[in-house]
Curated annotation (Swiss-Prot):
Residues 118-184 form the SAM domain. This is Sterile alpha motif domain-containing protein 10. PROSITE patterns: SAM_DOMAIN. It holds the Pfam family SAM_2. It comes from Mus musculus (Mouse). It comes from the Eukaryota. The lineage of its organism: Eukaryota, Metazoa, Chordata, Craniata, Vertebrata. Residues 1-22 are annotated as: Disordered. Coiled coil: none annotated.
Length: 202
């Protein structure tokens, strides 16, 4: 009795290999749709990778950090400092005037460097030209103290005495020539400044 009642109440078992209606076909449909989607995506990716990509690149440009840094270094432009209006001096004119007009060295007929840039050898040549009588005495004293052009313009009687020129006549001779040199350098400096100002106005 109980066996018959249980057989009536319990639902019939599905046979092996049987497929439920409306349920067994959906996994196959989902799997096929997923497979076709993946295949389409893969084909699109491969086709995109196979497309040759040529970026327009002008000469001198670069796409890497190192190349761009070298490019900036090679194409760097001089930085112009801020100046007041009307106070700018053309650099080309200033350099040409400084090294073409502002020259007083005795070695090449007054066409080399300014006195402040004279070496010890230039000072010795100047002494030989302007103080020929006691030239050897002056050259020995100036060489021992390494007198250059800048130091030559700053000489006075006390410095010459400490350098070993004990005679007053010798000191006066050197100081007189140094004074002439200072006046000549001052005049050349004023000429350079006036030419630079005139070039700025024009």
């Amino acid at each position: 009795m109980f066996t018959e009642l249980r057989s009536k109440l319990s639902p019939p078992r599905a046979r092996a290999g049987a497929v439920r209606p409306g349920f067994g076909e959906r996994p196959d449909v989902d799997a096929s749709a997923h497979f076709s989607f993946c295949q389409t995506l893969l084909e699109h990716t491969v086709s995109a990778e196979n497309i040759p990509c040529h970026l327009p690149r002008t000469p001198g440009t670069s796409l890497t950090w190192h190349d761009s840094r070298s490019q900036r270094a090679s194409s760097s432009r001089p930085i112009k400092l801020l100046q007041q209006p009307g106070s700018e001096i053309p650099q080309a004119r200033l350099y040409s005037d400084h090294y073409g007009l502002y020259h007083t060295s005795p070695s090449l007929g007054g066409l080399t460097r300014p006195v402040v840039l004279w070496s010890q050898q230039d000072v010795c040549k100047w002494l030989k030209k302007h103080c020929p009588h006691n030239y050897l005495v002056y050259v020995e004293a100036f060489s021992q103290h390494a007198i250059t052009g800048r130091a030559l313009l700053r000489l006075n009687a006390d410095k010459l005495q400490r350098m070993g020129l004990t005679q007053e006549a010798q000191r006066q001779e050197v100081l007189q020539q140094v004074l002439h040199l200072q006046v000549r350098e001052e005049g050349r400096s004023l000429k350079l400044l006036s030419q630079a100002s005139f070039g700025n106005m024009s």
